[in-house]
């Protein structure tokens, strides 16, 4: 599971995907908390909470220099762990991992990265307006089905 950055809840609890977005993510995947953490190693584009967005809605997107400072860790984790399934969550994680842009063009699709299957998801944050569109919610449901099928296979 590859996200953008830790949030406030994650920093306080020292565990990824602990806040509302994590609960939504687990609901999409039909996994309880224990199953989720037993199934996925969680990483992110950056290692530190970037702070609140200047608009006050959601978290600030890490700057390109912040992203580059943490790229070593992402590359190292991928080499060491050698995952069979990678789920980038949100536009930034998808761009950093696959070099692709546009959630509507990537969510619900399956990609290959080395020996790993990659299935992107949108970020489950309430700050994202992308999920308000019914067509996008269907793409998200499709991606969740693909991920569950991949989990059954690996």
Residue ranges of each PLM-predicted region?
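A polyanion-binding, active-site-adjacent surface
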Residues: 1-154
């Amino acid at each position: 599971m590859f996200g953008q950055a830790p949030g406030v809840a994650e920093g306080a609890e020292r565990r990824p995907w602990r806040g509302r977005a994590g609960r939504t993510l687990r609901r999409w995947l039909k996994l309880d908390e224990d199953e989720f953490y037993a199934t996925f190693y969680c990483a992110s584009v950056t290692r530190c909470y970037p702070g609140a967005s200047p608009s006050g809605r959601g978290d600030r997107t890490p700057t390109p220099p912040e992203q580059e400072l943490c790229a070593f860790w992402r590359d190292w984790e991928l080499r060491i762990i050698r995952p069979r399934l990678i789920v980038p969550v949100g536009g930034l994680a998808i761009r950093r991992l696959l070099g692709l842009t546009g959630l509507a063009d990537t969510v619900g699709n399956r990609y290959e990265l080395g020996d790993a299957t990659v299935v992107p998801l949108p970020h489950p944050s309430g700050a994202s307006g992308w999920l308000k569109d019914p067509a996008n919610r269907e793409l998200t449901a499709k991606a969740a089905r693909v991920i569950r099928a991949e989990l059954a296979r690996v």
